[in-house]
């Protein structure tokens, strides 16, 4: 079915920054998509177009990207008469209209909004749920569907929070649950226990939450954060059912070839900065003490040697985010260098749905896992909930069980699990190989 109208407007994300919303009209109705944005962004990502006009929105306006949709993409797209069910044709058209390697002419935020809205229109035309359409596009198995383990970001540090803590995200993964609904209940109970423990130990304001809904107390070290989480798991009565994931976002504290765990202090002691192997030793010591099953971005985005050295001995899931930025060329290099064994999939890093699906397929083909991810600047759009089920990846990270822009995705997964009934399995301990279940 052809598109009769494409329209974009500027709306706001969960941090109060402007972002792009696209509406695409067919005979079936109006289909909408809102594009997210990240706080720690990789240098190899597709370009998110911002206006740069400091007199409005601190330079973060998206009026240029919106104008590109309304004045450039919309007339050309409607005229081209593309069938929305042919996602590859939709995305190839958008990519060629832009004509740059990193989508910098029209903006990845303009292109992605149209790409995702088209997939919603296609699902409606086929009279199927979005996850079913996405499964068709990715040629994924649908009997049964796989519901993901939620990696819930319950404690924030790094660029997402104040305090001296260098590592960015401490996540709980309820792998011992039998269903997604049970996993979310367990996660929620641990989160509430963590909140009250945090207030008790660090004062009432320590219960305030960061960008992704996790608590952000004034913690100095990773051990202190992990002890707090382990205590919360025990207090909630869920010992043994929950594993821990870390997102170190270490590109943020990589300076002059070393890692500065005191990077928020402008006068940090250079003699205490760590080499790649020293940081690897720190991770190994944490893995011995705590039930850690996944570490994301343990090293900086171009420190390939440190990644490959650590991966040989890690023995747990190592997730590439800043390293690969959902970019097929970077993924191929990471596979070849044996730097990691899981991809963090963020649709806005590459800028179209087709390229995102291809990135997941390339990763699966190499025996990697795939973790579908939100961004820190999120919206009420629930697309990634359907995507994780459609792609059958078995794992998702979309913040804490708090803040509506995070819960929007988790609640959508509850609905999908309920709708699928017996045709759904929960990934559980097999989260790394959801595609094989």
Swiss-Prot record:
Keywords: Cytoplasm, Glycolysis, Isopeptide bond, Lyase, Magnesium, Metal-binding, Phosphoprotein, Ubl conjugation. Pfam families: Enolase_C (PF00113), Enolase_N (PF03952). The modification Phosphoserine is found at residues 119, 138, 188. The modification Phosphothreonine is found at residues 313, 324. One of its GO terms (molecular function) is magnesium ion binding. It is found in: Cytoplasm. Belongs to the enolase family. Present with 76700 molecules/cell in log phase SD medium. Homodimer. This is Enolase 1. It comes from Saccharomyces cerevisiae (strain ATCC 204508 / S288c).
């Amino acid at each position: 079915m052809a598109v009769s109208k494409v329209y974009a407007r500027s709306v706001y994300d969960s941090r109060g920054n402007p972002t792009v919303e696209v509406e695409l009209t067919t005979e079936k109705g109006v289909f909408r998509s809102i594009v997210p944005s990240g706080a720690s962004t990789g240098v190899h990502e597709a370009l998110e177009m911002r206006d740069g006009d400091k007199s409005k929105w601190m330079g973060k306006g998206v009026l240029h990207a919106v104008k590109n949709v309304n004045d450039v993409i919309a007339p050309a797209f409607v005229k081209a008469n593309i069938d929305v069910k042919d996602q590859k044709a939709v995305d190839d058209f958008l990519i060629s209209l832009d004509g740059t390697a990193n989508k910098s002419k029209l903006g990845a935020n303009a292109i992605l909004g149209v790409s995702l809205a088209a997939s919603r229109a296609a699902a409606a035309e086929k009279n199927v749920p979005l996850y079913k359409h996405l499964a068709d596009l990715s040629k994924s198995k649908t009997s049964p569907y796989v519901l993901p383990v939620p990696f819930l970001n319950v404690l924030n540090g790094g660029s997402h929070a104040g305090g001296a803590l260098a590592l960015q995200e401490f996540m709980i993964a309820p792998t011992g649950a039998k269903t997604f609904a049970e996993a979310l209940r367990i996660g929620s109970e641990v989160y509430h226990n963590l909140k009250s423990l945090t207030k008790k130990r660090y004062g009432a304001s320590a219960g305030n939450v960061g960008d992704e809904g996790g608590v952000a107390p004034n913690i100095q070290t990773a051990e202190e954060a992990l002890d707090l989480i382990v205590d919360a798991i025990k207090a909630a009565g869920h010992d043994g059912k929950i594993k821990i994931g870390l997102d170190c976002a270490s590109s943020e504290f990589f300076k002059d070839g070393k890692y500065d765990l005191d990077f928020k202090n402008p006068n940090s002691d250079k003699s205490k900065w760590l080499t790649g192997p020293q940081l690897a030793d720190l991770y190994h010591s944490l893995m011995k003490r705590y039930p850690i099953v996944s570490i994301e971005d343990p090293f900086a985005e171009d420190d390939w040697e440190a990644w490959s050295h650590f991966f040989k001995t890690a023995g747990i899931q190592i997730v590439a985010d800043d390293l690969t930025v959902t970019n097929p060329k970077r993924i191929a290099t990471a596979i070849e260098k044996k730097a990691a064994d899981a991809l963090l999939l963020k649709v806005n890093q590459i800028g179209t749905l087709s390229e995102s699906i291809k990135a997941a397929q390339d990763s699966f083909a190499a025996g990697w896992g795939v973790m579908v991810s939100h961004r820190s600047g999120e919206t009420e759009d629930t697309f990634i909930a359907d995507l994780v089920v459609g792609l059958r990846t078995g794992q998702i990270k979309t913040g804490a069980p708090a803040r509506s822009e995070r819960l929007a995705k988790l609640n959508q997964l509850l609905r999908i699990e309920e709708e699928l009934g017996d045709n759904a399995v929960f990934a559980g301990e097999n989260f790394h190989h959801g595609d094989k279940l």
